[in-house]
Amino acid sequence: MKILRTPRMERCIGCHSCSLACARLVHRMLSWDTAGIRISSSGGLSTGFEARTCLACLPAPCATACPTGAYSQRKGGGVIVKKSLCIRCGECARACPVDAIFLAAEGEPFVCIHCGRCVSFCPHDCLEMGDVATGEAERSNARESAP
């Protein structure tokens, strides 16, 4: 099982190609609000950019918080999303320890599903799909340091 990782963000120029690829190819919409990966400044133009995306928690707190079962645990980490079951309550977003579930204006949640469609659209090779075992320590550290 592979998960999306962002090991080379120092190369990122903030072009948002990955976000647009996710929105268009995965969610079939053309809005940054519908992407499962978000790029933002680390604190100013001179400090670079950071990617906010699902860290494939095991177990996934968002799946546990979902009252309808729209979010369920994915083997290897992360979640499987069944949009038809979602009631747009936002509990999944509130439960995410790294704020990686994004709510569109009408309350629909969007999260990275670790499909890898964004990887080939990054012109500077900032993203990659990695084996679950490789990202295990990183995912554990993120959950421990989350507020």
Question: What residue ranges belong to the model's regions?
Answer:
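Flanking helices and flexible, charged tails adjoining ferredoxin-like Fe-S electron-transfer domains
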Residues: 1-13, 23-24, 28-70, 77, ...
